[in-house]
Amino acid sequence: ELLANNKEAKDYINLKLTNAKVLYVNSYKGTVNTYVREGDTAIEMRTLGIDMPVNSIISGTVKVNLAYDAGIPYLSASKETNGENLKITESNEAAEPVIATVKDILDGKYTNDLIKIKEFTFSKEEYTTGKFNYYANDGENKIMIYDKFSGIGGVSKLTEGEKYTLTGIFGVIFRGIPEVLPIKAVE
């Protein structure tokens, strides 16, 4: 299973994938972010140099490095990373998001996974003149919404106090606050 035996940063992991699904692919500041789910675990693969289209199914082995960024794991290329031992099968069947709550994300569930949070209340806080942090609230808890993927979520145009549904990746913790990255417009 994906990362079952690897909980700390480590180089040259021989990662075995069995029917792993590519959830989302994006390029951000020169880094290709590929999010993959196997079973109930997901991981970000950063710039491995292997073409893994969205919705593809991946099986096989690949040597990678495991690192952590603010508690969020990701895989990067090692000197031995290549796709020789991977079977990548393209698919038109889209991955289904995991239905999550704001509290689930605060509890660290669904890291690097495709999630959907329904009926959260939107709020924003100005941190410097004209610049805002955006939040999904459930009445007691809040997490940040960060439009990392080219502003696709349209978060800056949402109305404070209104209820929305968000589909995105829980892929960042910023200053101790979990962030969800929209992969499509917030509804």
Predicted regions: what is each one?
Residues 1-61, 65-187:
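OB-fold nucleic-acid-binding modules
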